[in-house]
Curated annotation (Swiss-Prot):
Primary enzyme class: ligase
UniProt superkingdom: Bacteria
Record's catalysed reaction(s): tRNA(Ser) + L-serine + ATP = L-seryl-tRNA(Ser) + AMP + diphosphate + H(+); tRNA(Sec) + L-serine + ATP = L-seryl-tRNA(Sec) + AMP + diphosphate + H(+)
Enzyme Commission number(s): 6.1.1.11
Pathway given in the UniProt record: Aminoacyl-tRNA biosynthesis; selenocysteinyl-tRNA(Sec) biosynthesis; L-seryl-tRNA(Sec) from L-serine and tRNA(Sec): step 1/1
Molecular function, one GO term: serine-tRNA ligase activity
Species this chain originates from: Limosilactobacillus reuteri (strain DSM 20016) (Lactobacillus reuteri)
Bias (Basic and acidic residues) ranges: 49-68
Region (Disordered): 48-68
Protein name, per record: Serine--tRNA ligase
GO biological process: selenocysteine biosynthetic process; seryl-tRNA aminoacylation
Length: 435
């Protein structure tokens, strides 16, 4: 949520900045008009309340003097009725103002590349050497299905499109990856959390998914509950409506959770493989910090995500997203994209964002500064990382000509010493068939 006082004071600044995110100038004008009307209505209400107080005094004076108080009583009642009408009008105006404010995205940070599409993202750095294959690299879904560790067909039978069964060493690889990620983040000072997977509408509003993006999630019929699209929601809402003790800042938390997304609007895109699923595991990083430290914390968070990829020895690059491609709540976002050999391109595996006080205002999450004054915290979130996409990148980058997959060295201890996935060892209950 943006600060209405700042919009009132600098309307042209907000029109210019939010235009880069697709917001029309008229939308800012509407907010300013509603804010002006609100202040006028409140002034009228205060004036009438003062008049009613004066009329009430006249009633007492008339009774003390043995005079008729009928006129003063009538005036008091009429003013009371008008105040009730104004209160109703204020309530309706506030609801409309709140709704329009809730649909305005965060202001992009200076230097964020300006574009209403994803085109124009700026590459910050490229890390790792892209492997030169002496054979035609296969897609991860073909590798996984050939080894028997990924079963999309049976998942389709049981659940539908965009679901998968991980089997045998495939399931162990997924588990190895997310356990490795969590361990690495805890080394960097993050506290592991196991949060709820179902949240209420207030939580979805707090992190900015509601009201604008309801079509992208799974809601429980007949209840004010939603399956989380990301652990960002329960992690960031942990302190909703609270004042965080200053000595606790900055707070770093991390969690592994499933993420549930309807993928509305994704028809025809990434219909095969692990890239775009309705249910997938993701390790999330969330930070609460003082405003003066949030940009440094964004760089640290991005480095935390990069650390995983470096230790897995997976080639990737880091880009700054455009104004039109950032998430609704972000002021700046750094994306990490993994190299996928079979697709011959980079694919997103992490987004690290500084949301400034945008989410904190929606959640009413504050701290006290050195003068004891309440201030909004800044919140940051980042994937650390999307597990399925990381597994997909491992399958493609570590594949061998015979169809086997070598396990990244750092994951071997998490795989109980297994160094390679082959048809012979991939799925134990099929071993007798493969032998």
């Amino acid at each position: 949520m943006l600060d209405i006082k700042k919009i009132r004071q600098e309307p042209d600044f907000y029109k210019e900045k939010l235009a880069t995110r697709g917001v029309k100038p008229e939308e800012i004008d509407e907010v300013i008009a509603l804010d002006k009307k609100r202040r006028e209505l409140l002034q009228q209400t205060e004036t009438m309340k003062a008049q009613r107080n004066e009329a009430s005094k006249k009633i007492g004076e008339a009774k003390r003097n043995g005079e008729s108080a009928d006129a003063a009583i009538k005036e008091t009642r009429e003013l009371g009725d008008k105040i009730k009408e104004l209160d109703t009008e204020v309530e309706a105006n506030d609801a409309e103002l709140h709704d329009k404010m809730a649909h305005l995205p965060n202001v992009p940070h200076d230097g964020v590349p300006v574009s209403l599409t994803e085109d124009g993202a700026v590459e910050l750095r490229k890390v790792g050497k892209v492997r030169d294959f002496d054979f035609e690299p296969k897609h991860h879904w073909d590798i996984g299905e050939n080894l028997g560790i990924l079963d999309f067909d049976r998942a389709g039978k049981v659940s539908g499109a965009r679901f998968v069964y991980y089997l045998g060493l495939g399931a162990q690889l997924e588990r190895a990856v997310y356990n490795f990620m969590l361990d690495e983040h805890m080394k960097e000072g993050y506290t592991e959390v196991l949060p709820p997977y179902i949240v209420n509408a207030d939580s979805m509003y707090g992190t900015g998914q509601f009201p604008k993006f309801k079509e992208g999630v799974y809601q429980v019929n007949g209840e004010d509950m939603t399956l989380i699209p990301t652990a960002e929601v329960p992690l960031t809402n942990y302190y909703r409506g609270e004042v965080i003790p200053t000595e606790e800042l900055p707070v770093y938390v991390t969690a592994l959770t499933p993420s549930f997304r309807s993928e509305a609007g994704a028809a025809g895109r990434d219909t095969r493989g692990l890239i775009r699923m309705h249910q997938f595991n993701k390790v999330e990083m969330v930070k609460y910090t003082k405003p003066e430290n949030s940009w440094d914390e964004l760089e640290k968070m991005t480095a935390n995500a990069e650390n995983i990829l470096k230790k897995l020895n997976l080639p990737y690059h880091v880009i700054t997203l455009t104004t039109g491609d950032m998430s609704f709540t972000a002021s700046e976002t750094h994306d990490l994209e993994l190299w996928m050999p079979a697709q011959n391109k980079y694919r997103e595996v992490s987004s690290c964002s500084n949301c400034l006080d945008f989410q904190a205002r929606r959640m009413h999450t504050q701290y006290r500064d050195e003068n004891g004054k309440l201030q909004y915290v800044h919140t940051l979130n980042g994937s650390g990382l999307a597990v399925g996409r990381t597994v997909a990148a491992i399958l493609e980058n570590y594949q061998n000509a015979d169809g086997s997959v070598t396990i990244p060295e750092v994951l071997v201890p998490y795989m109980h010493g297994v160094t390679k996935i082959t048809k012979e060892n991939a799925v134990p209950f099929r071993n007798k068939v493969n032998k």
